[in-house]
């Protein structure tokens, strides 16, 4: 439900305010992307705390204050759930929402306008996979259902930018990030 994460962020903000008052420096909290850190961080956590359900039981850790990528929730639910964290990251943040590529443009526009009304800087995630052998396109595929090829190019959002998660079947991304991409439902 995010209650503990909210409690932690409120505590961190309180400490930041205390330090600002104490030394006069301007500190900020950034809702950070960590594409390469997601695998390393879970290993470090497990070394100290072991495997904890819903925290370190996957080969990656999700970024920042976002709902877990595997949550089966609508874009509106995701906006509503993440809103409570928004003002706690005063140094920068982005909210990611996954829209199926076949969404109608009026629906996408409505959701973006809703996000803007809520004060979000929202990244719209539109994934695409295509077969380099026959040209077939789908939202997400590991093997082309038309010709059986694994020679695919896949485009996914990578923490603020669109990136090739596969080019001609190969990837430059670490295994933890590829596992996170595979689990994506709401992000």
Spell out what each predicted region is.
Residues 1-187:
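Long, C-terminal-biased catalytic regions of enzyme "large/alpha" subunits
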